[in-house]
Amino acid sequence: MKTTQYVARQPDDNGFIHYPETEHQVWNTLITRQLKVIEGRACQEYLDGIEQLGLPHERIPQLDEINRVLQATTGWRVARVPALIPFQTFFELLASQQFPVATFIRTPEELDYLQEPDIFHEIFGHCPLLTNPWFAEFTHTYGKLGLKASKEERVFLARLYWMTIEFGLVETDQGKRIYGGGILSSPKETVYSLSDEPLHQAFNPLEAMRTPYRIDILQPLYFVLPDLKRLFQLAQEDIMALVHEAMRLGLHAPLFPPKQAA
């Protein structure tokens, strides 16, 4: 597992996590900026979730505040985790309808991008759609499948997650909109993903699993769902059969240059 400079903050005896004022200011900067950027770009289901969560702007929310809404809508919860967790823990949490949230926030120096998922990425990027039953069901199914999968199978499942939950787009009557949390928590990628620069491809789970990606660049290709309900339908299909077919067919050639050694 990779290492990180970030350390998740621990709760006090009452379960309350104390963040310094500088970190609340980072949250305020991020959420204020991103709420403007996603206007006319985020899908309606995500915007409905944002409204339901009622995220504070002036401070980092406590996890209990998020849990009250998620449990009332879809039965999900968020679970406090360290900055990085192993695949096994990740799948165990999703399989028990718990979404991992690392209780740290990026430094002002990494305001625009960091490789580790921080509390802003997890709560602002992902939690709004966990109020949606279709999205929540797909995420739950994904966790249960990942828990039983082999190491090799998990690599292909990870690509499916990346191309949907993290970096997915969806077709709407108003045009393409964003539902992927990796895009919705990034001002640059929110604008870029809907531009003419990247490729847009109709969603096909087999193709998504065969598509290589890099985590440190703007994505060269985005898969577009016909609607969000497609994720719920996918949860009813034999995803592991698709994994095995993807393993048999192999990966497509990458649409990006190899990462330069540090």
Swiss-Prot record:
PROSITE patterns found in the cross-reference section: BH4_AAA_HYDROXYL_1, BH4_AAA_HYDROXYL_2
Pfam families cross-referenced by the UniProt entry: Biopterin_H
Cofactor needs: Fe(2+)
EC number(s) stated in the UniProt entry for this protein: 1.14.16.1
UniProt pathway: Amino-acid degradation; L-phenylalanine degradation; acetoacetate and fumarate from L-phenylalanine: step 1/6
GO MF annotation terms: iron ion binding; phenylalanine 4-monooxygenase activity
EC class name: oxidoreductase
Top-level taxon of the source organism: Bacteria
GO-annotated biological processes: L-phenylalanine catabolic process
Keywords carried by this UniProt record: Iron, Metal-binding, Monooxygenase, Oxidoreductase, Phenylalanine catabolism
Chain ranges passing through the membrane: none
Binding site for Fe cation: 121, 126, 166
Catalysis: reaction(s): (6R)-L-erythro-5,6,7,8-tetrahydrobiopterin + L-phenylalanine + O2 = (4aS,6R)-4a-hydroxy-L-erythro-5,6,7,8-tetrahydrobiopterin + L-tyrosine
Protein family membership: Belongs to the biopterin-dependent aromatic amino acid hydroxylase family.
Assembly and interaction partners: Monomer.
Protein name in UniProt: Phenylalanine-4-hydroxylase
Organism (species): Pseudomonas aeruginosa (strain ATCC 15692 / DSM 22644 / CIP 104116 / JCM 14847 / LMG 12228 / 1C / PRS 101 / PAO1)
